[in-house]
Amino acid sequence: MTNIRKSHPLIKIINGSFIDLPTPSNISAWWNFGSLLGICLILQILTGLFLAMHYTSDTATAFSSVTHICRDVNYGWMIRYMHANGASMFFICLFMHVGRGMYYGSYTFLETWNIGIILLFAVMATAFMGYVLPWGQMSFWGATVITNLLSAIPYIGTSLVEWIWGGFSVDKATLTRFFAFHFILPFIIAALAAVHLLFLHETGSNNPSGITSDLDKIPFHPYYTIKDILGLLFLIQVLMLLVLFSPDMLGDPDNYIPANPLNTPPHIKPEWYFLFAYAILRSIPNKLGGVLALVLSILILAIIPLLHTSKQRGMMFRPLSQCLFWLLVADLLTLTWIGGQPVEYPFIIIGQLASVIYFSIILILMPISGIIENHLLKW
């Protein structure tokens, strides 16, 4: 009799994806982030579900309903802060995952990479809409500023913004629809993640050396299930340290003030994980130009496979490209810092320089370094 996990129509899919999956024997801890992202998504859906049981998406009661969750619901404060800080952990894992893909040349799996970019946009949209729901000052003004960017689109811009708002300003209709979208999007993300995995398993995983590993594959279970559990323990430890000791460290104090359309906060800024893109947006004095730069800062990932000039897949044996990669990481950290600073000298010029460096590294310097390294191979 054949094993049920290999014959049952449903269980054999799980078996092929998580148990008997042939995996390269040399993948490092940088390959942990895919499973961690899956766990983050499940955690966010579960905590979000419990929050939705007590939340009301009405401008009059949204803020007080969140307060009610924190004060009156059993462990409501913990569920709320796990959800808020879980989003931060989600983005840390996302950035690491994308960075790993760039470093080791995983973008040569085109379908997997492109679905990954769609996933990134979907997660960013979900996080943005989630930030609006508590209806604090930063929620309201963040929603106003970011949705207003669409008015830069020629001809249809203003109509589009009012259509999204459901009126002439961010109001009850906006909050209700944002809640609806924030609830449905994680399930769409889960479906996209399954497709992401489907395409990945068509080709098999990449590995640090960048060369084919078909000759040296090992089963996913028990080797990588154990390795992933170690990563999971680290993730939960960091998350619970944040939740239990400094739950508001990554948040904005202004969001504890109820939304007031008549009073603008001194510095409107998004959550920390959007600051790099926000800095790029602010560094261009033109509204439409800024919006284009903002979108391109993420969409640029889609053309990375076209800019690959090296004969080698990853950067493991390419010191010049490694230097550029870590320069890019430093540049993104600089942009993140600048995004949280007020719009004044010297922050404006630093932001503009960092934005130029960001696009220059990806579009110009990395392809050139690939060509130089190809020539060095001939020596």
Curated annotation (Swiss-Prot):
Family annotation (PROSITE patterns): CYTB_CTER, CYTB_NTER
InterPro entries named among the record's database cross-references: Cyt_b/b6_C, Cyt_b/b6_C_sf, Cyt_b/b6_N, Cytb/b6-like_sf, Cytochrome_b, Cytochrome_b_C_euk/bac, Cytochrome_b_N_euk/bac, Di-haem_cyt_TM
Cellular localization per UniProt: Mitochondrion inner membrane
Annotated binding of a ubiquinone, by residue: 201
A GO molecular-function descriptor: metal ion binding
UniProt-annotated binding residues for heme b b562: 83, 182
Cofactor note: Binds 2 heme b groups non-covalently.
Function, as annotated: Component of the ubiquinol-cytochrome c reductase complex (complex III or cytochrome b-c1 complex) that is part of the mitochondrial respiratory chain. The b-c1 complex mediates electron transfer from ubiquinol to cytochrome c. Contributes to the generation of a proton gradient across the mitochondrial membrane that is then used for ATP synthesis.
Family that this chain belongs to: Belongs to the cytochrome b family.
Protein name (record): Cytochrome b
Gene encoding the protein: MT-CYB
